[in-house]
Design a protein with these regions (language model features):
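Bacterial N-terminal signal peptides that target proteins for export
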Residues: 1-11
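C-terminal motif of bacterial Sec signal peptides marking the signal peptidase cleavage site
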Residues: 20-24
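Solvent-exposed loop and capping/linker segments of extracellular ligand-binding repeat ectodomains
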Residues: 26-496
Length: 496
């Protein structure tokens, strides 16, 4: 049978995608159809489309190696002017008047739009009237005009603050593409900071760079959910403040990384007041400040995620859930060896009613400092079995826990610097403490430790049980010296 070769092309534009159908008829009886899907948003340059009459302003405060161009409705390319603050006649930005439906496209052969961070000078696009933003952002930072295929951002802070304070609205079918899979330090820092964006663009990179997404969506009140974040290889501060104060955010994506980096998630969802579910946190290798303030002030978050790590890092959980008022139960904390500041402020101002078990006998400086401070609903403390203390280890641990009533036992004999400093300050309902200390080895270990404790009208007696021959006395003065064994007036001293 005679063979025929027939090539037929058809292009269908649907939801921002071009579907090209290639039909190859090998013979009359066996045709084959192989659809090839292309993303029109990758093939189009960065485009700003006016939803209403207004103006688009482009501010270029930095001298770049190559000019930045724009075109309106596919017309002739025009150069964005450089703002010279020393020229009294210079206009601070390039003003583009637009009507509904006008499209402004942008191009540049530079590798970065940020060359003068030391003087806070950069490149910004702004518009107060509503505009769609779609197309490929790489049209702004591709030196070989290869932006359609470019997947690498080469220089630091390349697109920093690009759409700061803009009135972005979501196009019904088109999308903004950030296709880079190889990122640079701070490449997207503050990119949409304080903008009206409602749908975040896809972020396909699986290997991150330092500060790459830092403050990217900070204070974006209309953002409801995060984009997928598939990265498994993180970098220091990669998600730092990424969604800070996104007060409409209700959904957070999975965070699959098991090895963390310094401050990688620090402040990531802080002040996301509508967030109701935390992502799973499977990491077992932690880093300094990795979760610091991650969910701070997430006042609608009812449950803390599981925390499986058994080896901690300095300040790793510092203030992680601070001011999460709806969290009433702490996750299990399986680590037995503490690190400096590891749990400091972790549950401060939460709704906990009972402290989790803290089995460690190997403490570290500030390891439990302010851990449960201002937990007004906390009524039950936990056993503190450590007999060897460290500087500030329990400092402010239960301060302002006004409903704490359970008896406290403190078995350590030596008290280092500030170890019990303000530990039970304003625990108004606390009535019983057992302290076996016999020696102070550092300054201020008992500073304000029981100040105002047990002063609620419901408390009839207050008792401090102590080691024999320790010279405790009742005094309302601050304990500052190594011999100031002070307990407030009204407490009964009972020697073992």
């Amino acid at each position: 049978m005679k063979k025929y070769l027939l090539w037929m092309f058809a292009a269908i534009l649907t939801s921002g995608l071009i579907v090209t159908t290639l039909t190859a008829c090998v013979n009359d009886d066996n045709p084959s159809v192989d659809p090839v899907v292309e993303d029109v948003d990758l093939k189009d340059p960065l485009t700003i489309e006016a939803v209403e009459d207004g103006e688009i302003d482009i501010t270029m405060e930095v001298v770049l190696p190559e000019p930045v161009y724009y075109s309106v409705n596919g017309g002739e390319k025009q150069e964005v002017s450089l703002y010279d603050p020393h020229d009294p006649q210079a206009h601070p930005y390039t003003k583009i008047d637009v009507k509904v439906g006008d499209k402004v496209q942008l191009f540049s052969r530079n590798t970065t739009l940020s060359k003068d961070r030391d003087n806070n000078n950069g490149f910004y696009i702004s518009f107060e009237s509503e505009c769609y933003v779609y197309g490929n952002v790489m049209s702004l930072i591709s030196p070989d005009d290869n932006w359609k295929d470019n997947r690498e951002i080469k220089e630091p802070y390349a697109l920093e603050m690009l759409f700061y304070y803009t009135n972005i609205v979501t196009h019904p079918t088109r999308h903004l593409r950030l296709p880079a899979t190889k990122l640079s330090k701070g490449c997207y820092v503050g990119m949409f900071n304080s903008s009206a964006i409602t749908d975040a663009p896809e972020l396909p990179a699986t290997q991150l760079a330092e500060l790459c997404y830092a403050r990217m969506f900070t204070d974006c009140p209309n953002l409801k959910k995060t984009p997928e974040l598939p990265a498994t290889r993180l970098a220091p501060r990669c998600y730092y403040y990424m969604f800070w104060a996104c007060r409409g955010l209700t959904e957070a994506t999975e965070l699959p990384a098991t090895k963390l980096e310094e401050e990688c998630y620090a402040y990531m969802f802080c002040w996301c007041e509508a967030l109701t579910k935390a992502p799973k946190l499977p990491a077992t290798t932690l880093a300094k400040d990795c979760y610091a303030y991650m969910f701070g002030s997430c006042v609608s978050l009812p449950d803390a995620p599981e925390l499986p790590a058994t080896q901690l890092a300095e300040d790793c959980y510092s203030y992680m859930f601070a001011r999460c008022k709806k969290i009433t139960e702490a996750p299990e904390l399986p680590a037995t060896t503490m690190v400096k500041g590891c749990y400091s402020g972790m549950f401060s101002e939460t709704g906990l009613t009972k402290a989790p078990e803290l089995p460690s006998t190997q403490l570290a400086e500030s390891c439990y400092e302010a851990m449960f401070s201002y937990c007004d609903d906390l009524t039950e403390a936990t056993a503190l079995p450590a007999t060897q203390l460290e500087k500030r280890c329990y400092s402010y641990m239960f301060t302002h826990c006004g409903n704490l009533t359970s008896a406290i036992e403190l078995p350590a004999e030596e008290l280092p610097e500030r170890c019990y400093n303000s530990m039970f300050f304003k625990c108004f309902k606390l009535s019983s403490v057992k302290c076996l200390a016999t020696t102070m080895t550092g300054n201020y270990p008992l500073m304000s430790w029981l100040k105002y404790a047990g002063t609620d009208e419901s408390v009839s007696t207050r008792t401090l049980t102590h080691a024999p021959e320790t010279p405790w006395v009742n005094s309302d003065e601050d304990s500052t010296g190594l011999t100031d064994w002070f307990v407030p007036t009204g407490w009964t001293l009972v020697s073992l």
